[in-house]
Amino acid sequence: MRKSGCAVCSRSIGWVGLAVSTVLMVMKAFVGLIGGSQAMLADAMYSLKDMLNALMVIIGTTISSKPLDAEHPYGHGKVEFILSMVVSVVFIVLTGYLLVHAVQILLDESLHRTPHLIVLWAALVSIGVNVGMYFYSRCVAIETNSPLIKTMAKHHHGDATASGAVALGIIGAHYLNMPWIDPAVALWETIDLLLLGKVVFMDAYRGLMDHTAGEAVQNRIVEAAERVPGVRGVIHLRARYVGQDIWADMIIGVDPENTVEQAHEICEAVQAAVCGKIRRIESLHVSAEAREIGDTTKPSFSDQPLSFDEVMLSKVDN
């Protein structure tokens, strides 16, 4: 990691998020009940979601950081995607229920009430805290490339946005004499929660399906490899995410006149260059094939998973 404090933050982010989200959830639920705000009660669901996600971060990062073993040659990184999917499914179900409830209140004018101004102050506190937590968790997510911590950052961003909507709704209800705004904001929040749950679910689904590391990452790998002296281009590259880490293998072109030992030295130099250039590469296996000067064939990309033998070989090579 780039800074010495990053390791400390990555270990504490889950506990900090859990404590903050628990306090916010209790505050929002209490204020929503005594202040008569449906929007604030729905906003409490954002903090409950954040709280559960923080628990998933604590559990997931603990398990995913375990070393490789014979039964798990790819490591334990996918547990983060599994837990992200569980959280998303739970909230899609819960917010579906809240959506129906919000529609019922919005359509029944007898249930429209102007919330107490204490709700406005609670919303402002929530905005400030969640903006701070968003930047904190986003920084950790960038350093660790953890899907769970990325999800945490998204959740805090959504929570801050929702609290902002609650604040605007309270202002509208009080100063524009529009008490229906509060249940309308509650309806918007539930729809937003559903959409957020869908995004998290699809991200977790792609992770479980061994999605490719992406063209941008693959191009950076190729660029780093082709800068190594003796490399005559990258012939084939296969890279994918396993949890927060990248597993890849590549075939490079070398001079047909090179000895086996010389080709092996070039492969080792490529490994060092690529791993030094691109963070989060857990495994990189490099092999060489003869390639004549002037062959400008572009590298082929593949997202097919490595075999068990290839995985164990690449770990030995690294």
Curated annotation (Swiss-Prot):
Changing residue 264 to A: Wild-type magnetic response, no change in magnetite crystal size, number or shape. Significantly decreased magnetic response, many fewer, smaller crystals in vivo, isolated CTD does not bind cations. Keywords: Biomineralization, Cell inner membrane, Cell membrane, Ion transport, Iron, Iron transport, Magnetosome, Membrane, Metal-binding, Transmembrane, Transmembrane helix, Transport. Changing residue 50 to A: About 50% magnetic response, fewer cells have iron crystals which are smaller, in addition to magnetite (Fe(3)O(4)) crystals of hematite (Fe(2)O(3)) also form. Induction: Part of the probable 17 gene mamAB operon. It is a multi-pass membrane protein. Changing residue 9 to S: Wild-type magnetic response. The chain crosses the membrane at residues 13-33, 39-59, 81-101, 117-137. Its main location: membrane. Fe cation 3 binds at residue 289. One of its GO terms (molecular function) is monoatomic cation transmembrane transporter activity. Changing residue 139 to A: Wild-type magnetic response. Changing residue 260 to G: Nearly wild-type magnetic response. Changing residue 289 to A: Nearly wild-type magnetic response, fewer magnetite crystals of normal size and shape. GO terms for biological process: iron ion transport. The keyword Transmembrane applies. Pfam families: Cation_efflux, ZT_dimer. SUPFAM superfamilies: Cation efflux protein cytoplasmic domain-like (SSF160240), Cation efflux protein transmembrane domain-like (SSF161111). Fe cation 2 binds at residue 264. GO terms for cellular component: magnetosome membrane; plasma membrane. Disruption phenotype: Single gene disruption has no growth defects, no accumulation of magnetite, forms empty intracellular magnetosome vesicles, decreased levels of MamB, mislocation of MamC in 1-3 foci or rarely in a shortened chain. Magnetosome vesicles are fewer and smaller, aligned in a chain with the filament, only a few have very small crystals. Other, possibly precursor magnetosome vesicles are visible. MamI mislocalized to cell inner membrane or in 1 to a few patches. The C-terminal domain (CTD) is probably responsible for hetero- and homodimerization; it assumes a V-shaped, dimeric metallo-chaperone-like fold that can open and close. Val-260 forms the hinge between the dimers. Binds up to 3 divalent metal cations (probably iron in vivo); upon binding there is a conformational shift to a tighter dimer. If the CTD cannot fold correctly the function of the whole protein is decreased, suggesting the CTD confers functionality on the transmembrane domain (TMD), perhaps activated by ligand binding to the CTD. Belongs to the cation diffusion facilitator (CDF) transporter (TC 2.A.4) family. This bacteria makes up to 60 cubo-octahedral magnetosomes of about 45 nm in diameter which contain membrane-bound crystals of magnetite (Fe(3)O(4)). Expression of just the minimal mamAB gene cluster (MGMSRv2__2365 to MGMSRv2__2381), including this gene, is sufficient to form a minimal magnetosome chain with small magnetite particles. Essential for magnetosome formation; required for stable accumulation of MamB. May nucleate iron crystal formation. Probably binds and transports iron. Binds divalent cations, possibly up to 3 Zn(2+) per dimer in vitro, probably iron in vivo. One of 7 genes (mamLQBIEMO) able to induce magnetosome membrane biogenesis; coexpression of mamLQRBIEMO in a deletion of the 17 gene mamAB operon restores magnetosome vesicle formation but not magnetite biosynthesis. Forms homodimers via its C-terminal domain (CTD) in the presence of metal cations. Interacts with MamB via their CTD. Isolated CTD forms homodimers. This is Magnetosome protein MamM.
